[in-house]
Amino acid sequence: MAYPTVDSPYGLKPVNLIGGQVFAGSTRMYNIDYAYATDIFYGDFVALVRGNLERISVTSGTAGTLVGIFLGCSYTNPTTKQKQFSQYWPASTAAGDCVAYVCDDPDTVFQAAICSSGTTIASGARAMIGQNLACLNNTGNSNTGNSKNALAAPTDTPATTSSLPIRVMGLVPETAVSLGTATYTSISTATVTCSALPFALPVGTDVGSLAANGQYIPSGSFVDTAASAGATSFILNQAPVTAFGASATLVFTQYPELLVKLNFGQHEYYAGTATA
């Protein structure tokens, strides 16, 4: 079993930079306006509006308005009058000295969970690497202060659409879940018939097969529609690159997390038009 188990999304977490550079934890400080009326959670997308930081809902794209990812803040607590360091900005806090910490490097690589809808964990796949994804905008957790934003699992071929906010850089093998195997029977277009699945397949599940010599053969495809345990068929997003062999052993792997970066043109530092 994979460890740790990923049971809910947590926004975007910086891990390194493209080109193998190390993320040193460096952030840029921006102000949040007095009594700004929206919660901002750790891992949320943020933008600048008239010099102040605001949370921004990101689903299909932002066209050069993002300034980065929110990583906490500090402000004078209006009740205790003491400096408070917080994982998130509570909406409508009557503080005018808030400093937010933002991961603003456009080349940052982030780790994020992928969901089919809301906060339902799905799967990434090898076939998604190099492609673009949309995001799911969810309300964060005020108990932990963490974001609940997620990557949106595609139900078809991952998009090449330039307006989508996220580029997939890689899988996170440390949290991969080996779902098991089934015996291949036949395929019609992208619908695969097999022995009864002893497990459910979430959207995005990576599918491969075993060659006669025991080597793993990636299909270049993933599960398009969630399949229930006991099902004798499932649907791929497209036909496999290499046809499954007769009675081949099909191998199913769930990757609940992906490595991603902001797609080109999403970050305001790489946009010619300044924010209003």
List the model feature ranges, each with a label.
Residues 1-178, 208-219, 249-276:
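Surface-exposed, low-hydrophobicity beta-strand/loop segments enriched in small/polar/acidic residues
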Residues 35-37, 128, 133-134, 187-245:
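Extended, beta-strand-rich, solvent-exposed assembly scaffolds of outer structural proteins
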Residues 177-189:
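Disulfide-bonded cysteine-rich modules in secreted/extracellular proteins
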